[in-house]
Design a protein with these regions (language model features):
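Glycine- and aromatic-enriched mobile tails/lids
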Residues: 9-11, 15, 20-22, 28-37, ...
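Glycine-rich active-site loop/strand segments that organize a redox cofactor
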Residues: 35-69
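Helix-loop-beta segment of a Rossmann-like dinucleotide-binding subdomain
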Residues: 59-63, 94-120, 184-188, 292-303
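Short beta-strand to alpha-helix junction loop
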Residues: 61-71, 109-124, 139, 190-198, ...
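Conserved redox-cofactor binding core of oxidoreductases
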Residues: 81-167, 172, 179, 220-225
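FAD-site-proximal beta/loop scaffold in flavoenzymes
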Residues: 146-170, 322-364
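Glycine-rich loop(s) and the adjacent beta-strand/alpha-helix scaffold that form part
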Residues: 175-230, 287, 369-389
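An anion/pyrophosphate-binding glycine-rich loop and adjacent beta-alpha core
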Residues: 203, 209-322, 389-395, 432, ...
């Protein structure tokens, strides 16, 4: 969407992607996109959507930005509909909406169970129009290495590497917008694509860009267990009537419905995840003694499931071998999304002038917990804000990038060329894939659902140990063509830096808020921590500070999904 908005203004765009754009991780977003269109006459409104989002994020999101997103949401859905997205419809021909977690309204527009893919494909068709017109130039299969920042601390372009030829080049720009997604690979196995290392955001953090709320990591309650990676089972399965249960005293126990009678199986993700973790890990009531519970759709007619959830049910059947139309699925929580990201202002610009960010790469719309189906919305809305603001910035800049000497850009290119050469020459005894496996294990065990300070301290010590061992990596592949090992090693270095941001942010936040839960500090502490965590890079590790959250529109209140939202306002 950022590319489209810039090209609409007649400004040329270079679009870089690690993979072919249609293989970006947005294709894995299954369930839908939120917007208070209110076709079902439930009294929904953008303000209700806004209140649900702020309440669901445990009041850590800046409120004016979130309100702007929720007010724009209905128009965004209608825009995507006009672009040709095949949204499901009611028998009357109206857009159909399903219910997602953390709301009592049917607010989520959907295209079966492949909404992200359909949105991405529709947007790419629009990008191709501008490509034909000569306004957009795609660079697919390029890895972002770093921003070009001049002596005045202004972003002037990027340095990137062609992952086929391994050629490193600089690209001048009056404005740069980062839409590089999340960092799930830091945790080893996750629902994220294997490209989601967070390397680009980490590199910018090391260059002086502030990183906000890094500790806020969403663990999705329903993922398909697997030995290689974890695959998402969409919240839409519960939105269409799926029920989570396990056996207790020899009988089915629908524990979410018992614990949270008001919202049942559609409590927000952090709440459901902690409940499943408690049932399996603390109570030992997982299915067959394993860390798994049932997600049951077998009571719903198969023809209904095929229309609304066919894609994801086929995925489960393919990888597990059971037909979820006939037998309950086995699921368990998995790392899914980063609410934290690059710090940006209301214009989507970072603290480095000329450098913008949108989507999961930045932090401002989800607070301490993202509501399901707000992700695709925030990506599109963030792009709609970032694009025009980047154009406005570029047109009003005092000194154009064209007036800068070539030596500035050559120095950055040489810096990253030298770094690549040093990686190729690493001749130690450590395996980068083994280091990554250890990092993922420690992060998954200690920095996800339940966080204990002593374990967080040991995890940070482990990360520093891995950073020392990183210096002794053995580069088995020294080829200069499509060298995936060298690229992975560079990403691993950046993952290690970001892992410290996440871990130390969690260690220092002595409260429980949204996805961040500490048994030692089980209550929310608004007096000390109704604040955004800001991490800034130093050679000795992240330097943390805190920034007040905008709560000017809705006063913070107790978050309790066992009762209706109205009761919490009393």
């Amino acid at each position: 969407m950022t590319t489209i908005k810039i090209a609409e203004a007649g400004v040329p765009v270079k679009l870089f992607s690690l993979v072919p754009v249609k293989r970006s991780h947005s294709v894995c977003a299954q369930g839908g996109i939120n917007g208070a269109v209110n076709t079902k006459g439930e009294g929904d409104s953008p303000w209700e959507h806004f209140d649900d989002t702020i309440y669901g994020g445990d009041f850590l999101a800046n409120q004016r930005q979130v309100l702007g997103m929720c007010e724009a949401a209905p128009a965004i859905i209608h825009l995507m509909d006009r672009m040709g997205v095949m949204f499901n419809r009611t028998p009357e021909g109206l857009l159909d909406f399903r219910r997602f977690g953390g709301t009592k309204h049917h607010r989520t527009a959907f295209a079966g169970a492949s909404t992200g893919q359909q949105l991405l494909y529709a947007l790419d068709e629009q990008v191709r129009r501008y490509e034909v017109a000569g306004l957009v130039e795609k660079y697919e299969g390029w890895d972002f290495l770093g921003a070009v920042i001049d002596d005045e601390q202004i972003c002037r372009g990027i340095v990137a590497q062609d992952l086929r030829s391994m050629e490193i080049m600089h690209f001048r720009a009056d404005a740069v917008v980062m839409c590089t997604g999340g960092n799930g690979l830091i945790f080893g196995k996750s629902t994220n694509s294997m490209i989601n290392t967070g390397s680009a955001g980490s590199e910018l953090y090391q260059q002086g860009v502030k990183y906000a709320n890094g500790e806020m990591i969403q663990v999705h309650p329903t993922a398909i267990p697997g030995d290689d990676k974890l695959r998402l089972m969409s919240e839409s399965a519960r939105g269409e009537g799926g029920r989570i249960w396990t056996y207790k005293d020899g009988k089915p126990w629908y524990f979410l419905e018992e614990m949270y009678p008001e919202y049942g199986n559609l409590v927000p993700r952090d709440v459901a995840t902690r409940a499943i973790h408690k049932v399996c890990v603390e109570m030992g009531l997982g299915v067959d003694g394993q860390n798994q519970v049932y997600l049951d759709l077998s009571h719903i007619p198969a023809n209904v499931l095929n229309v609304k959830l066919g894609n994801i049910l086929d995925i489960y059947e393919k990888f597990v071998g059971d037909d979820p139309r006939k037998v309950p699925m086995r699921i368990f929580p998995a790392v899914h999304y980063s609410m934290g990201g690059l710090w940006v202002d209301i214009d989507q610009m970072t603290n480095i002038p000329g450098l913008f960010a949108a989507g999961e790469a930045e932090y401002q719309y989800h607070g301490a917990n993202r509501l399901g189906a707000n992700s695709l919305l925030s990506c599109i809305y963030g792009g709609m804000v970032a694009g025009p603001n980047a154009v406005r910035y570029a047109k009003n800049i005092k000194k154009s990038v064209d007036s800068l000497p070539e030596s500035l850009f050559e120095s950055y290119t040489k810096k990253y060329q030298d770094d690549f050469e040093s990686i190729l020459k690493m001749e130690g005894d450590e395996n980068p894939y083994q280091l990554h496996r250890e990092l993922g294990q420690w992060m998954n065990d200690n920095v996800t659902v339940v966080r204990v300070n002593e374990r967080l301290k040991k995890t940070d010590e482990k990360i520093q140990e891995l950073q020392e061992r990183f210096k002794r990596i053995h580069m088995a592949d020294t080829s200069r063509w499509e060298n995936q090992m060298a690229q992975f090693t560079r990403h691993l270095r950046n993952m290690l830096h970001m892992a410290r941001v996440i871990t130390l942010g969690a260690l220092n936040r002595n409260e429980s808020r949204g996805a961040h839960y500490k048994p030692e500090f089980p209550e929310r502490d608004d007096e000390n921590f109704l604040k955004t965590t800001i991490a800034e890079f130093t050679p000795d590790g992240p330097k943390l500070s805190y920034e007040d959250v905008d709560v000017s529109l809705i006063k913070p209140r107790l978050r309790n999904y066992a009762v209706s939202k109205e009761e919490t306002k009393e």
